C-alpha cells in the first residue's frame, strides 16, 4: 500500500530545459556580481573557504568565478556550487526574475494526492534551499505546502540505493510504502533496490519500460 510519494524535480515535475537553460543560465550570468557584492559576508566566506580546502589552494574572487563557472558548464553536481546557486536564485525568485516551472499535470496531481492524505517529498540534486525557492515562487504561486519534506544529495547520490534507504529512515516510512517518480532509469533502479515502488516519467520519449508513464495524469493510486 502506497502512503508516500517521493518525486524528482528536473524532468519530472518540471521542465529540464527550464532548470538547465533558464536557472543555470541565470546563476552563471549573476555569478561574478553576486560573489563581488557578498564577498565579505559569512555565507560566501564559508563557501570559498570550503572550496580552498577542496582544491588545496587559496581562492581569490577571479579564481572562484572561473571554478564555479566551469562547474556550471560541465554540469558538475558540486555541493558548494549548489549552495552558491541557492543564494543567487533566491535573489532571482524574490525579485520576480525567476519563477519555478511546474507542469500543469504535476501541479494538479500533487494537489490531489496531498488532499487525499498522501505524504509528498521531493528529492533533487538541487539544494533543499533551492527546492523550497523553486516551489515557493512557482508559476502557481507558493506550493511548498504540498510537500512534507525535501531531500538533496546530502543524503547521497540519486543513483545509490542507500540514499533511498536513508530517506525512508528519515521519514519513518517503510520503503515499500513509497512511490518514487523520476525521469532517470538509474535512479528508478536504485530506488527499487532499496525496496521502493517506482515509475519512470518519460515526457519526451516513448515508454519502453513496464512501469512507465508519460505524465502525472497516468498515476493511479
Curated annotation (Swiss-Prot):
GO terms for molecular function: 2,3-diketo-5-methylthiopentyl-1-phosphate enolase activity; 2-hydroxy-3-keto-5-methylthiopentenyl-1-phosphate phosphatase activity; acireductone synthase activity; magnesium ion binding. Gene3D superfamilies: 1.10.720.60, HAD superfamily/HAD-like (3.40.50.1000). Its EC number is 3.1.3.77. Keywords: Amino-acid biosynthesis, Hydrolase, Magnesium, Metal-binding, Methionine biosynthesis. Transmembrane segments: none annotated. This is Enolase-phosphatase E1. It catalyses: 5-methylsulfanyl-2,3-dioxopentyl phosphate + H2O = 1,2-dihydroxy-5-(methylsulfanyl)pent-1-en-3-one + phosphate. Belongs to the HAD-like hydrolase superfamily. MasA/MtnC family. Pfam families: Hydrolase (PF00702). Its cofactor is Mg(2+). The keyword Transmembrane does not apply. One of its GO terms (biological process) is L-methionine salvage from methylthioadenosine. The keyword Hydrolase applies. Binds 1 Mg(2+) ion per subunit. Monomer. Pathway: Amino-acid biosynthesis; L-methionine biosynthesis via salvage pathway; L-methionine from S-methyl-5-thio-alpha-D-ribose 1-phosphate: step 3/6; Amino-acid biosynthesis; L-methionine biosynthesis via salvage pathway; L-methionine from S-methyl-5-thio-alpha-D-ribose 1-phosphate: step 4/6. PANTHER family: ENOLASE-PHOSPHATASE E1.
Amino acid at each position: 500500500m502506497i502512503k508516500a510519494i517521493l518525486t524528482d524535480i528536473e524532468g519530472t515535475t518540471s521542465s529540464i530545459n527550464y532548470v538547465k537553460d533558464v536557472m543555470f543560465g541565470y546563476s552563471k550570468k549573476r555569478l561574478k556580481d553576486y560573489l563581488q557584492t557578498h564577498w565579505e559576508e559569512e555565507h560566501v566566506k564559508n563557501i570559498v573557504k570550503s572550496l580552498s580546502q577542496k582544491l588545496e589552494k587559496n581562492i581569490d574572487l577571479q579564481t572562484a568565478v572561473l571554478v564555479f563557472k566551469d562547474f556550471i558548464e560541465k554540469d558538475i553536481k558540486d555541493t558548494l556550487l549548489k549552495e552558491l546557486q541557492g543564494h543567487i536564485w533566491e535573489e532571482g525568485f524574490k525579485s520576480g526574475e525567476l519563477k519555478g516551472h511546474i507542469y500543469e499535470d504535476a501541479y494538479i496531481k500533487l494537489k490531489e494526492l496531498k488532499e487525499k492524505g498522501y505524504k509528498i517529498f521531493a528529492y533533487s540534486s538541487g539544494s533543499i534551499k533551492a527546492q523550497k525557492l523553486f516551489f515557493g515562487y512557482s508559476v502557481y504561486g507558493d506550493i511548498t505546502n504540498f510537500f512534507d519534506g525535501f531531500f538533496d544529495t546530502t543524503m547521497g547520490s540519486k543513483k545509490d540505493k542507500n540514499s533511498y534507504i536513508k530517506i525512508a529512515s528519515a521519514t519513518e516510512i517503510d520503503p515499500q510504502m513509497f512511490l518514487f517518480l523520476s525521469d532517470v532509469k538509474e535512479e528508478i533502479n536504485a530506488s527499487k533496490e532499496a525496496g521502493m515502488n517506482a515509475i519512470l516519467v518519460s515526457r519526451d520519449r516513448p515508454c519502453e519500460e513496464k512501469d512507465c508513464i508519460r505524465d502525472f495524469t497516468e498515476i493511479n493510486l
